[in-house]
Amino acid sequence: GIAGMMIDFMDRDDQEMIRIQEEFLAKAAKHHLFVQFHGACKPSGLSRTYPNEFTREGTLNYEHCKWDKDTDADHDIHMPFTRLLAGAADYHLGGFRALPKDKFKIQQSNPYVTSTRCHMLAMYVVLESYLGMICDTPEAYEGQPGFEFLQTVPTTWDKTVVPDASVNEYVAVARRHG
């Protein structure tokens, strides 16, 4: 059997779409399935009633690096203070083809990300997402430093502490699993 599903291309946030999403969650819960909403609006609180909602995109995401350079570390520093307050995010992390913004070039196949590998790895701990993903092809990770971390980093945490943060400037997050 299957454990869950990704539902995509719900690019609106009107009352009817929220009702449709709730119906998806209710039916999936009856069958003990998780749901990942991709290409969906910001969270509306449904995950409080339906904890089978694992993640929801509702963000400017690294998939946009295929056509622009707006998703970068400057964008990411807003996330813990804005979008993540509403719930876990489906966020494409782990791009190992990382370049600084001044060297970045748009490329549809094997795209680059405007970041650093260290930043990409840190975001797996900073951002809350119950469904850890990598956003690149297998060849981008084979034999690369940091890939072992991606294979073992937890997606749930027993304790989270934010020892220091300044809105839209920096955030330090410490998490414990087990």
What role is predicted for each listed range?
Residues K101-L121, V125-L127, G132, S166, ...:
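Long hydrophobic segments that form regular secondary structure
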